[in-house]
């Protein structure tokens, strides 16, 4: 056997070994990307939450037992490409370490929750960031998202031995931002000046009318004339005149 034949014989066990290592550490990839709920739903995007469709039927062929957890991975968009599935879910994967890790795990479920093909009248959704009461340090906390994003999410199925399967990353998700009122340059300033001028003129007119009314009222209620005062001083009642007539008689 020549030297090339010997090299081929030596390479075969090495290739088999590499194949076994890769298959043992690789994750099953599920050809599914998480989707935002339809645009017609009010509140699917807010300043701190977003709403996903449930991955119904996506884990039915995965080698999992029913109690095995399926997590939702929430990541900063720029950290998604560097994400490595943890061998075990720990406290460091809670939202408190979101900025340091670039991701956190939340909304623990199992494939029983995500069974598909069953008629259901209820709208089955996942509301990310909808829990204001959980501790940021606790595993699975679904706390409000800290900013507008962008974010990416994926589902990660795990067993007691470690990660088993994962979906694709979603598209970038941007949350709503608070809108600040800004005056339109030029046009709104001129309109404001016109309104202020009109109100000033109206106020001046009302003030003049008020002064005229006050002056008129003062003139009409001024003191009586001297003639009226004389008449009032010499006025005697009928009763007093009768008494004087009786005395003179």
From Swiss-Prot:
Residues 27-194 are extracellular. GO terms for biological process: response to oxidative stress. Glycans are attached at residues 63, 82, 133. The keyword 4Fe-4S does not apply. GO terms for cellular component: membrane. The chain crosses the membrane at residues 195-215. InterPro entries: Haem_peroxidase_sf (IPR010255), Uroplakin-3 (IPR024831). It is a single-pass type I membrane protein. Residues 1-26 form the signal peptide. GO terms for molecular function: heme binding; peroxidase activity. Residues 216-249 are cytoplasmic. It comes from the Eukaryota. Keywords: Glycoprotein, Membrane, Signal, Transmembrane, Transmembrane helix. It is found in: Membrane. Its main location: membrane. Belongs to the uroplakin-3 family. This is Uroplakin-3b-like protein 1. It comes from Mus musculus.
């Amino acid at each position: 056997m020549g030297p090339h034949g010997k090299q081929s014989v030596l390479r075969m066990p090495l290739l088999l070994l590499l194949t076994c290592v890769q298959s043992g550490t690789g994750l099953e990839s599920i050809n599914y990307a998480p989707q935002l709920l339809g645009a017609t739903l009010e509140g699917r995007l807010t300043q701190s939450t977003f709403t996903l469709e449930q991955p119904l039927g996506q884990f039915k062929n995965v080698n999992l037992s029913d109690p095995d957890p399926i997590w939702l991975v929430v990541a900063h968009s720029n950290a998604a490409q560097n994400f490595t599935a943890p061998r075990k879910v720990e406290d460091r994967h809670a939202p408190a370490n979101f900025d340091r890790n670039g991701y956190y795990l939340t909304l623990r479920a199992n494939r029983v929750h995500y069974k598909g093909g069953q008629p259901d009248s209820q709208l089955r959704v996942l509301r990310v960031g909808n829990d204001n009461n959980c501790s940021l340090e606790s595993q699975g906390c679904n706390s409000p998202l800290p900013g507008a994003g962008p974010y990416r999410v994926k589902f990660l199925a795990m067993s007691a031995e470690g990660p088993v399967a994962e979906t694709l990353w979603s598209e970038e998700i941007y949350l709503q931002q608070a809108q600040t009122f800004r005056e339109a340059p030029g046009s709104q300033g001129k309109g404001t000046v016109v309104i202020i001028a009109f109100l000033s003129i109206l106020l001046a007119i009302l003030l003049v009318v008020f002064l005229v009314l006050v002056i008129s009222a003062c003139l009409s209620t001024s003191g009586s004339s001297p003639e009226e005062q004389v008449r009032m001083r010499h006025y005697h009642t009928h009763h007093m005149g009768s008494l004087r007539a009786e005395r003179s008689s």
